[in-house]
């Protein structure tokens, strides 16, 4: 488990939660990899939920800037897994609903089928106060990470 820290990059657009949460996800993932001595390649999947397309791309950029490149095949986002690019959902899904659905439905099935053995799963969140945001306040983000592992046999 890697506990997240509140990260505030002064994102004020309450319609862009991915941009508000991606910096916290990048911070948590970077610290997790440093603390464990692992690399992104040590995981079958690295999953965020729910940054959506905008936050997903921003996380890739932030990690590259930090010298920890991720590939877009190994790193996936729950909102992007639930919705296809053809659907008009704009940035993503519903946050905790996306994370829970993907983890319990899709990821656990991959573990049962022995298709994956180690996953870094990051739940992301925005510390959003609609009133504060409407008054021009920033939206800090946070992300916590757990590693799920199964025997390879």
Q: Language model features by range: what are they?
A:
Residues 1-30, 35-36, 72-80, 118-123, ...:
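Condensing-enzyme catalytic core mediating Claisen C-C bond formation in acyl metabolism
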Residues 3-7, 47-53, 125-126:
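Glycine-rich beta-alpha junction loops
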Residues 6-8, 16-20, 24-42, 54-63, ...:
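Conserved active-site "lid/cap" helical segment
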Residues 51-66, 131-138:
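Short glycine/threonine-rich loop-to-helix capping motif typified by GTGT followed
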């Amino acid at each position: 488990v890697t506990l997240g820290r509140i990260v505030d990059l002064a994102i004020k657009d309450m319609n862009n939660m991915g941009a508000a949460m991606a910096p916290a996800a990048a911070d948590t993932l970077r610290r997790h990899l440093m603390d464990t001595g692992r690399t992104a390649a040590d995981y079958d999947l690295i999953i965020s939920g729910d940054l959506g397309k905008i936050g997903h791309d921003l996380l890739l950029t932030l990690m590259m800037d930090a010298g920890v490149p991720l590939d877009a095949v190994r790193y996936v986002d729950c909102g992007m897994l639930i919705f296809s690019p053809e659907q008009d959902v704009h940035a993503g899904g519903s946050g905790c609903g996306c994370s829970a659905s993907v983890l319990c439905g899709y990821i656990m099935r991959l573990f049962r089928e022995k298709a994956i053995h180690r996953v870094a799963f990051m739940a992301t969140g925005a510390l959003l106060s609609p009133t504060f945001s409407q008054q021009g306040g920033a939206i800090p983000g946070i992300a916590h990470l757990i590693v799920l592992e199964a025997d390879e046999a």
